[in-house]
Design a protein with these regions (language model features):
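Short glycine/proline-enriched loop/turn "hinge" motifs that connect secondary-structure elements
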Residues: 116-121, 176-177, 326
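Class I S-adenosyl-L-methionine
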Residues: 130, 155, 176-218
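Short SAM/SAH-binding signature in class I
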Residues: 329-335
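Conserved S-adenosyl-L-methionine
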Residues: 207-325, 340, 348
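Basic Arg/Gly/Lys-rich low-complexity intrinsically disordered segments
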Residues: 1-33, 401-527
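Accessory substrate-recognition/RNA-binding modules or partner subunits associated with SAM-dependent
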Residues: 34-171, 188, 194, 201, ...
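Conserved hydrophobic/aromatic beta-strand scaffold that supports enzyme active sites
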Residues: 174, 397-401
Length: 527
């Protein structure tokens, strides 16, 4: 009872209700229940996973597209989609669909929209363009044309024009053109949702957080066993696994979302979503991350502590070639080097070693491996039970499952063993869809500048070494929801990473100006 009581005390102590705030019950029911079209973007190969997340969240009219899932929902659903989805890159709210066969057509259609409803006086805006069209070959040209139409409307109606802000706009717009079909949307997310907010430092070619979460969700693991990443790098897979195991919303670390700057932003509604911990659950197993690079190990420990999962995750300096059979039921999910961006002296030998360790030291468990080189997979020397195609940036990879059992396959099945579930068979079927869309890969380089934060954002900067003034600017703009240094909940092991600095659980400041602090702590003794 002591540990449970302690956790409840911490949660209750740091939950605040702003004085004088409106009761959600008093808000117009019609406004809250009004549904509209929404689009969640993701990586190629994760659409099915994202659709399942949206369905579980309660979204309506869920339909899968290429690198996106469309759905309908009200304002609460839009807030929840940003805050709770693990596999969404951003959430868009379409405000206009139209056909444009020329630049003049597009300009005229954009001017038809009443922009005074979306961009208030004194507010700034930006436009991102994604273009797949023979007519509109230059995305920057599309961006400028949309911007001109908006600015000209304001100048004609008011005599003044809104300013453009690329780095920190009040309103973010997104236009998507496929041949002559255009969709103009409000970007409700802002910075790409893969930027969770817990990453303090990184290593070369870190795994994108959205892709990591998608990989874990594709395995079906939700915390029922121990989780092992034997080549953990900066710790992305272990941290995303902890979020999934404890059912914690990945948006909890975010400083802000774009919708918080909208004219119709409902602070009370978002506070109720943020403070709702009813779906969080206990995690009775453990997560392990190993790496041979000591710098990666220290970086992973730093990121794990920043996320508040030191009780759930153990990071150690270990070589997988010395891996031995775990005592408890476990799953391995790993992202070994491919040789594309990271130079590995004996790449094929590494994969051969992986297969040998799995075959002799992982009986009775399952392992999932992401790679894109067929010759690497061949060196593993094991037959995968499932192959799921997925893109890692511009690399067309495969995520393969290896069911490790002792003896013959027929004997394993006779004893009730399952090599491939029905859901996994459906995922496998997606491979044929990929083969029909090979041309998409050729377009990725063309769209890199359009969606740098979505598709190719694998470079993260050290806050300490490369941006010494980051902390000052960060706090001047808006206090983060998690603020290191509040207490000693992370323990002495974390202090050693930062010398005299004490990085406790981050303190959350919601509500913009005058907002009271909220705190969330995931590192309690109960875990």
């Amino acid at each position: 009872m002591g540990e449970k009581h302690e956790r409840e005390t911490i949660i209750n102590k740091y939950k605040h209700k702003k004085a004088g705030s409106r009761n959600i019950d008093s808000i117009s029911t019609n406004k809250l229940m009004e549904e509209f079209e929404l689009i969640a973007k993701t990586f190629m190969g994760l659409e099915q996973v994202l659709a399942q997340e949206l369905t579980q969240l309660g979204a309506n009219n869920v339909q899968i597209g290429r690198r996106m899932v469309s759905f309908t929902g009200n304002k609460e659903m839009m807030y929840r989609a940003n805050f709770q989805l693990h596999t969404a890159i951003r959430v868009l709210k379409p405000i206009a669909h139209f056909k444009a066969n020329s630049a003049e057509d597009m300009y005229d259609e954009v001017r038809k929209i009443d922009w005074s409803k979306y961009i208030l006086k004194g507010k700034t805006f930006s436009v991102d363009s994604v273009v797949y069209s023979e007519e509109f070959k230059n995305s920057r040209f599309v961006t400028y044309k949309v911007k001109d139409a908006i600015v000209d409307q304001f100048r004609e109606n008011t005599g003044t024009r809104p300013n453009i802000s690329v780095s920190n706009p009040d309103i973010r717009l997104n236009i998507h053109i496929a041949e002559d079909k255009a969709t103009l949307s409000l970007d409700s997310s802002g910075e790409s949702l893969h930027r969770r907010g817990y990453r303090q430092e990184s290593v070369e070619a870190p795994l994108n957080e959205v892709l990591a979460a998608g990989m874990i969700l594709m395995t079906g693991w939700k915390g029922e066993t121990d989780f092992i990443d034997p080549m953990c790098g900066s710790g992305t897979l272990p941290i995303e696994a902890a979020l999934i195991a404890r059912n914690i919303s990945p948006g909890v670390f975010r400083k802000e979302f774009a919708f918080e700057k909208w004219a119709d932003f409902d602070q009370d509604l978002f506070d109720s979503i943020y403070n709702d911990e009813s779906e969080e659950r206990e995690f009775t197993h453990h997560i392990y991350g190993y790496d041979t690079d000591m710098k990666a190990v220290n970086t992973a420990k730093l990121n794990v502590a920043a996320a508040g999962f030191s009780k759930n995750i153990t990071i150690e300096h270990k070589d997988f070639k010395n891996f031995t059979q775990p005592k408890d039921k476990s799953i391995i999910v790993m992202n070994p080097p491919y040789g594309e961006r990271i130079s590995t002296p004996n790449l094929l030998g590494t994969y051969k070693m992986i297969g040998e360790r799995l075959k002799h030291q992982f009986m009775g468990n399952e392992a999932w491996i992401l790679s894109y080189r067929e010759e690497c997979f061949r060196e593993i020397g094991l037959k995968p039970s499932i192959k799921i195609p997925v893109y890692n940036g511009s690399l067309e990879c495969e995520f393969r499952k290896y069911q490790m059992f002792d003896g013959k396959l027929n004997e394993f099945r006779a004893e009730g063993g399952i090599v491939k579930t029905e859901d996994e068979k459906k995922e496998m079927a997606q491979k044929h869809r990929f083969k029909k869309n090979r041309e998409f890969k050729k377009r990725l380089d063309d769209t890199e500048s359009n969606e740098e934060g979505d598709i190719r954002s694998f470079t993260f900067h050290s806050f300490e070494h490369e941006r010494p003034d980051f902390g000052k600017k960060f706090n001047e703009k808006r206090k983060p929801r998690r603020n290191f240094g509040d207490d000693d909940r992370f323990g002495d092991d974390y202090k050693s990473f930062k010398g005299k600095k004490n990085f406790g659980g981050k303190k959350f400041d919601k509500g913009g100006k005058g907002g009271k602090n909220r705190y969330k702590n995931f590192d309690t003794n109960e875990d």
